[in-house]
């Protein structure tokens, strides 16, 4: 009887299956990355502000941990790891829990509900309307910027980076609608209501000259009573490969401004400023522990303000005490590299 040759001897054994250690290792690495992303998004305070201030850096760009989720999911699909794909649900849930409500309220990640002049203020609407803008010392059209801001109809308008050469243009453009104004150094305030008690606020970090004046306080005599208005421009921060998140001068200035606010005797306080920091940055705790950020209370979207061409952070702030934010939004771009921000505040 003729047999069938199978090509295999009796002693031969099936070839062992190839180990999947590498695939599993890659899958586990993605799981770890997903868990870390979720933890850092939910608890940025876990990262200390050691050399380079990594904690503040994470808090500054915290919303931008969101794009890590689709990247992790794509890598999980490429690795064909079901466990890694499922793990991406954790950072997705954390991110949506933190930032989803702001997006669902309306507005996108960048515009924060760019409004027009519906909140025009003269006290008759039952709310105080304020506008804050770093007008830029390189603004090619100061007068046009001033007119655009006035169209929003704020009761008070705060400006930073006011250079002596551009100041007359701002004064002329705003004179008709804002009979009261005060300027200290490179910051100023224009108001529909009388101002009194204007003076500088010393927020100068150590090592800077006496000509560095970027803080002021005045009292606006509004229909709701006196309101202490602070205008400030904190020092810039830098991100470098060697120094990391260089924010020491900004942090020192924020602490000084916080002490000034803590000593304020009036019940109603408004801070308008380019703080070069987001409200969630731990370095601004001297301010956020005493004042309520208007955008967090009544804004839509992320309300990003800088840089104006493609905003990635909200460093221009309205913060209050003794007043209730009812709306907060960004205004259309001007000749500045910052977007203006506005808020309506109920007494």
Predicted regions and their residues:
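A charged, solvent-exposed segment within the mature domains of Sec-exported extracytoplasmic proteins
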Residues: 1-3, 14-19, 240-251
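N-terminal, active-site-proximal structural segment of metallo-dependent hydrolase catalytic domains
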Residues: 2-171
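Soluble catalytic domains of enzymes that build or remodel membrane lipids, polysaccharides, and related
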Residues: 126, 136-150, 158-347
């Amino acid at each position: 009887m003729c047999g069938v040759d199978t090509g295999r001897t009796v002693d031969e054994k099936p070839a062992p299956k190839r180990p999947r250690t590498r695939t599993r290792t890659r899958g586990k690495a993605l799981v770890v990355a997903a868990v870390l992303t979720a933890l850092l998004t939910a608890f940025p305070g876990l990262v200390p502000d050691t050399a380079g201030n990594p904690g503040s850096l994470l808090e500054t760009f915290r919303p931008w941990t969101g794009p890590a989720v689709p990247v992790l999911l794509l890598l999980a699909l490429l690795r064909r790891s079901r466990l890694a794909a499922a793990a991406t649900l954790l950072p997705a849930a954390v991110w949506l829990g933190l930032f989803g409500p702001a997006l669902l309220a309306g507005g996108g990640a960048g515009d924060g509900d760019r409004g027009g002049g519906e909140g025009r203020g003269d006290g008759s609407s039952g709310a105080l309307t304020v506008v804050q803008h770093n007008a830029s010392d390189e603004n090619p059209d100061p007068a046009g910027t001033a007119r655009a801001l006035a169209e929003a109809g704020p009761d008070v308008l705060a400006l930073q980076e006011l250079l002596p050469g551009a100041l007359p243009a701002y004064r002329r453009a705003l004179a008709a609608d804002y009979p009261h104004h005060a300027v200290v150094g490179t910051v100023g305030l224009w108001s529909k209501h009388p101002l009194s008690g204007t003076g500088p606020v010393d927020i100068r970090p150590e090592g800077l000259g006496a000509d560095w004046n970027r803080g002021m306080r005045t009292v606006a005599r509004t229909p709701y009573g006196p309101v202490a208005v602070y205008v400030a421009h904190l020092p810039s921060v830098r991100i470098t490969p060697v120094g990391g998140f260089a924010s020491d001068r900004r942090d020192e200035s924020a602490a000084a401004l916080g002490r000034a606010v803590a000593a304020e005797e009036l019940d109603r306080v408004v801070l308008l400023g380019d703080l070069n920091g987001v409200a969630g940055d731990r370095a601004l705790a001297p301010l956020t522990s005493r004042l309520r950020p208007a955008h967090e209370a009544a804004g839509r979207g992320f309300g990003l303000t800088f840089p104006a061409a493609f905003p990635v952070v909200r460093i221009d702030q309205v913060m209050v005490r003794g007043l209730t934010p009812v709306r907060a939004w960004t205004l259309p771009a001007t000749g500045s590299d910052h977007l203006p921000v506005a808020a309506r505040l109920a007494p």
